[in-house]
């Protein structure tokens, strides 16, 4: 893509880029309340792991189909992976969909949407740490270390400090601990995408890994005795929306990254946890927890950390 081509694209217009990025963050932020609402409309109990896996699987199979269709329409050609890419798709699905969302769906059955949104933001700080020290994809910098430190400080503060965390009182593995595991898998998958996208279109990787990972989760849930019963039209609408969350956000975000400097787009990711907290307050009735002084300070530190980690001066 040449600079001349970039300059002609509407996606390079700053207001459009910002609005689209924020829309993506609204979609991602709505995932926590959407999943908790899904448990209600599908009548899935917190202890029903098998049915929960079927719900997650159905969501991501649908998201995979949507992503490939949306991507094909934008590219004006069918997005089909190369034979050599299936190993990348399989590895990516293991981390980005199977691992991450096994724990993500577990967590939201056992904790609040507000807590889930703030803890899940830790993936933004695990990712650069893994990229620097584990995968050697980036060089360490004071700026990134400061950003990660601020972000983790915000998450620790949310639970009342290290003393409260080490006492074990505010954290359960099935709730907050599971969301931390989900963030871990998210960070690893982000590093995998950076590596694998050298060999395959990232939209193809995302779409097909969603579908593959979703199918695996669905089959595991089905074989484990789960049920996914559509009690009303609300069940269909909820599932379609959850599929669109991933497909719409990943597709649009990918388009923005294609036409703009990465840092100009990724720095707006700070909106994601904010939307998660706000939407949990609006749709789940968690306003008291969301707008407490402790939550707001924690959210400020987390968001500031994301900005610092991703901010880079743009070349003139």
Question: What are these language model-derived features?
Answer:
Residues 13-18, 48-50, 81-87, 162-185, ...:
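Juxtamembrane helix-entry segments on the extracytoplasmic side of multipass membrane proteins
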Residues 25, 36, 67-68, 127-129, ...:
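Transmembrane alpha-helical segments that form core, pore/gating elements
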Residues 41, 45-96, 126-130, 185-189, ...:
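Transmembrane alpha-helices of multi-pass small-molecule transport proteins
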Residues 54-57, 61, 65, 105-139, ...:
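Specific alpha-helical transmembrane segments that line the substrate/conduction pathway
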Residues 2-54, 168-195, 238-239, 244, ...:
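Glycine-/small-residue-enriched transmembrane alpha-helix faces in small-molecule transporters
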Residues 72-116, 120, 157, 242-260:
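Specific transmembrane alpha-helical segments of multi-pass solute transporters/efflux pumps
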Residues 67, 129-130, 142-162, 270, ...:
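Hydrophobic transmembrane alpha-helices of multi-pass small-molecule transport proteins
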Residues 58, 97, 115-122, 193-215, ...:
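Helix-helix packing/entry segments at the starts of transmembrane helices
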